[in-house]
């Protein structure tokens, strides 16, 4: 724990209070994902999916077992189907959230299949 170094971008911003911080230049603005309804709708979709397909082990969702082309194709087909249903105006389920879910699944499997070229995403926990 004591071995880490606080990263330094070099540029500083001084606030009216006198507090000084690195600038936010070039950093991801994670607050932006909270704008609009989709983050909550996706979380609701994931919660309902987790009730239907429980975690096979603590901290690992059922969909995270996906690891190959077959699963990637299933995610892709489902994303296309839910997109068409959303565009058609179907309201039998949250098709917009289902598109998010399936695109995320595709990206997850694609990352596993192309680890050397895929952007690396770290777990938050």
Which positions does each model-derived feature cover?
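Intrinsically disordered, low-complexity regulatory regions
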Residues: 1-125
């Amino acid at each position: 724990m004591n071995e880490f170094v606080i990263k330094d971008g070099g540029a500083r911003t001084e606030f009216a209070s006198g507090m000084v911080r690195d600038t936010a230049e070039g950093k991801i603005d994670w607050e932006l994902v909270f704008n609009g309804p989709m983050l909550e709708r996706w979380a609701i979709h994931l919660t309902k999916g987790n009730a239907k397909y429980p975690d096979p082990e603590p901290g690992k969702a059922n969909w995270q077992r996906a690891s190959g082309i077959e699963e990637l194709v299933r995610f892709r087909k489902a994303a296309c189907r839910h997109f068409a249903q959303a565009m058609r105006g179907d309201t039998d389920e949250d098709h917009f959230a289902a598109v998010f879910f399936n695109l995320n699944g595709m990206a997850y499997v694609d990352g596993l299949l192309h680890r050397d070229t895929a952007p690396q995403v770290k777990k938050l926990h």
